[in-house]
Amino acid sequence: MQPAMMMFSSKYWARRGLSLDSAVPEDHQLLGSLTQNKAIKSEDKKSGKEPGKGDTTESSKTAVVFSLKNEVGGLVKALRLFQEKHVNMLHIESRRSRRRSSEVEIFVDCECGKTEFNELIQLLKFQTTIVTLNPPESIWTEEEDLEDVPWFPRKISELDRCSHRVLMYGTELDADHPGFKDNVYRQRRKYFVDVAMGYKYGQPIPRVEYTEEETKTWGVVFRELSKLYPTHACREYLKNLPLLTKYCGYREDNVPQLEDVSMFLKERSGFTVRPVAGYLSPRDFLAGLAYRVFHCTQYVRHGSDPLYTPEPDTCHELLGHVPLLADPKFAQFSQEIGLASLGASDEDVQKLATCYFFTIEFGLCKQEGQLRAYGAGLLSSIGELKHALSDKACVKSFDPKTTCLQECLITTFQDAYFVSDSFEEAKEKMRDFAKSITRPFSVYFNPYTQSIEILKDTRSIENVVQDLRSDLNTVCDALNKMNQYLGI
C-alpha cells in the first residue's frame, strides 16, 4: 500500500538582536542615561518645548540605518550621539551587514525635530557609514530575511499553490497498474483530477456521485478490513470509526463524501481535508499538515483487484487516515511534523517525510501489552496489516534519528516497522528531533488567523507570550473556582 505522499537548502542567515555590546559594562550606563533622556523628552513634549532649548519645534518619527565595525564599544559610541542630540530612540535592531562581513547594520526608529536629526546625521557620518535615511518601516522585511529559505505558505489560503503543484496526476497510470488498459477508468480518473485542480480554499468540496462499480469496490475493502480492526487497530481508531459511520455515512454500500468528513474532523480535532489530483512533494504535503489540512484523493482503486492498489486512493484516505485524524493527540502529532518542515532544507524535509512514513503511514503502538496498528498504510491494507502484527515482521523501537535512515518500500511489505508506547511519546521524540533541523527561526501556528508566524526576534515572541498568558489566566481562574468548590 503506497502512502499518501512519497517523492522527493536552506542556509543560516544572521540573527537579529537588540544589542551587539550587551556584555560591555559601559552599555548599562548608556542605557540608563538613554532611559532618563526619554523621560525628559516626554516631559518636554507635554510642555511643548524642544529638549534642551527654549524654542519649540515639531517632532516627528523617522529612521536611519547605519553600519559600523563589529567591535566592542562601537554601538555605544554611536548611540551616545543620539543622546547628545536629544533624539528619542523608539526601537533598535541589529543584523550582520550584507555588504561587509566584518560590519553590522543598525536600524534605529527615532523621534526628533528636523534640525536635531540633520545634526545627528552629520555626526554619525564621522563614526559610521550611513546606509539609508528615513527608510520604510519594513526596511528589514521578512521576505528579505527569508530569501535563502525554501518557500512555504504563510497563510492557509496559500495551500492552493501547494495543492496544485502535483508531481504525478491521477490519470498517469503505469503499465502495471490494474486500470492501465481500461479507458473508462482512465476517463473517470481524469474527472477526479479536474475536480481537485478546480478546488480553492474556502469552497465546499464538490460532492461526487460514485458509480455502482466504485461503490462495490469500496464495499469489498470496507467489509474485509472491518473484520481485522477489532484485533489489529489501536483503541483511538476503534473509538472513532463508529462515529464516522454515524455522522459521515461510513457503510459498505456508501462511499463517504469528503465534505462531510472534513466538517466532522473540524469539530473533533480541528483538521480539515481538501481534494488533491495526485502526488505532492513531501514539502508541499507536510505544509498542509502544519495547517491541520490533509490532502485527500477522491478516486477509487480499480475494481479488478479491490484488495490491492499501487497508489493512495479514497479507500486508503478514508479508512486509513481519517479515523485517527479525528483524535486530538494524533492530530497534534501530525501537525508538529508539518510545522517542523516549514522552511527546512531538502535534506531535513526528507528525514521528516521518512519519519512520517514510518509513523503516520506504517506506525505501530503498544496497548494493553499488545501491538496495535495506527499507520494508515497498514489500516487500509489487509495483507500488510496481518503481516505487521505477525511474528514474521521486524519491529523496532521508534527513534527518529535512526528511523529517518530506514528505506521506504512502496510495492512490497516494509523491512521494518517502528513501535511507540503512545502518540504522546512519539510526539515528544519528534519534538526533540525537530530541534536538530537547520532552521534559524521557529514557527508558530496562529489558530485565530490560520497563519504561520515566524519567531525570530523579541517582538514576535512577545506576541505569542501574550496569547499564552491569556490562556494561562483562563486555566488559573478555572483552578481557583475548583479549589473554592472543593473547599481547598
UniProtKB/Swiss-Prot annotation:
Residues 34-60 are annotated as: Disordered. Residues 40-58 have a biased composition (Basic and acidic residues). The keyword Phosphoprotein applies. Its cofactor is Fe(2+). One of its GO terms (molecular function) is tryptophan 5-monooxygenase activity. Its EC number is 1.14.16.4. It comes from the Eukaryota. Belongs to the biopterin-dependent aromatic amino acid hydroxylase family. The keyword DNA-binding does not apply. Expressed in brain. PROSITE patterns: ACT, BH4_AAA_HYDROXYL_1, BH4_AAA_HYDROXYL_2. CDD domains: ACT_TPH, eu_TrpOH. The modification Phosphoserine is found at S19. Pathway: Aromatic compound metabolism; serotonin biosynthesis; serotonin from L-tryptophan: step 1/2. It catalyses: (6R)-L-erythro-5,6,7,8-tetrahydrobiopterin + L-tryptophan + O2 = 5-hydroxy-L-tryptophan + (4aS,6R)-4a-hydroxy-L-erythro-5,6,7,8-tetrahydrobiopterin. Keywords: Iron, Metal-binding, Monooxygenase, Oxidoreductase, Phosphoprotein, Serotonin biosynthesis. Fe cation binds at H316, H321, E361. GO terms for cellular component: neuron projection. Residues 63-138 form the ACT domain. One of its GO terms (biological process) is serotonin biosynthetic process from tryptophan. PANTHER family: AROMATIC AMINO ACID HYDROXYLASE (PTHR11473), TRYPTOPHAN 5-HYDROXYLASE 2 (PTHR11473:SF16). This is Tryptophan 5-hydroxylase 2. SUPFAM superfamilies: ACT-like (SSF55021), Aromatic aminoacid monoxygenases, catalytic and oligomerization domains (SSF56534). Interacts with DNAJC12.
